[in-house]
Design a protein with these regions (language model features):
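Structural signal for interior beta-strand "rungs" in well-ordered beta-sheet cores
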Residues: 1-187
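Terminal amphipathic alpha-helical/low-complexity segments used for targeting or macromolecular assembly
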Residues: 1-5, 10-11, 16-17, 53, ...
Length: 255
């Protein structure tokens, strides 16, 4: 059902069984997939592609121009996959031509009230961003990671999969896979043991992850030496995840 007060641009493509509430504005070059629910007073601008079964709550602004001063009105994009919940007052900006030209959000994510996703961000699957968490431009957030309320993430930071970031933390450097971080600026605390349990990693894998963490953070080793010793632990998934996130770091990891 589309409310009669909703304003929908003629170029917008609306899928089947989509609900659009009163006073919502769907702009030009927007594609909305089947079974989406968009509440009242939402603004969706394009070019944007929104997949299936996404639920967007009131007063959110999706796909607006980036405030990046380099942006000159280029037709950059936003892609949101499937089964996401986007709560009240969330803002998500499109990309810039200086980067990928696209902001991307995966599937099965929960963005709580007043979350901000900046231009050119890449958000994986199954993440949770709690109220007022903010990603600056060009940030990458790995699958299954959780950002607590009021977390601020500096531009270009990469946060690996299965991370947990504590309340009001300020993230200035990359966070390796399954690491928990707290503070301002954030510092590593331990492995995300509870998160790994919930994702059904075995007890042996969690022990292995903890051994790798201690090599990285508790032995006082130079990073290259720590990476070498972690690699010697084998090729289990947790080791591969950790090494990949360290080797892909562009800003240096938190230490």
């Amino acid at each position: 059902m589309i409310h009669p007060t909703a304003i929908i641009d003629p170029s917008a493509q609306i899928g089947e069984n989509v609900k659009i509430g009163p006073w919502t504005h769907i702009g030009a070059h927007v594609k909305i997939g089947d079974y989406c629910e968009i509440a009242s007073h939402v603004v969706v601008k394009g070019p944007s592609v929104i997949g299936e079964r996404n639920k967007i709550y009131q007063f959110s602004t999706i796909g607006d121009d980036t405030p990046d001063l380099k942006y000159q009105g280029e037709p950059t994009g936003l892609v949101i996959a499937n089964n996401n919940v986007i709560r009240e007052g969330v803002t998500i900006h499109r990309g810039t031509v200086q980067d990928r030209g696209e902001t991307y959000i995966g599937s099965n994510n929960l963005l709580m009230a007043y979350v901000h996703i900046g231009h050119d961000c890449i958000v994986g699957d199954h993440t949770i961003l709690i109220n007022n968490a903010s990603l600056a431009g060009h940030v990458s957030l790995g699958d299954w990671s959780i950002l607590s309320g009021y977390v601020l993430v500096h531009q270009y930071v990469h946060i690996g999969p299965h991370c947990f970031i504590g309340p009001s933390a300020i993230i200035l450097h990359d966070v390796p896979a399954f690491v928990t971080a707290y503070g301002s600026p954030a510092e590593p605390r331990t492995i995300n043991r509870e998160g790994l349990k919930r994702r059904e990693f075995s007890a042996e894998q969690i022990v292995l992850a903890n051994r790798a963490y201690k090599l990285l953070y508790r032995r006082g080793l130079p990073l290259k030496e720590a990476v070498k010793e972690i690699a010697a632990l084998g090729d289990d998934e947790v080791i591969t995840m950790l090494l990949t996130s360290i080797r892909n770091s562009t800003r240096g990891i938190i230490r």
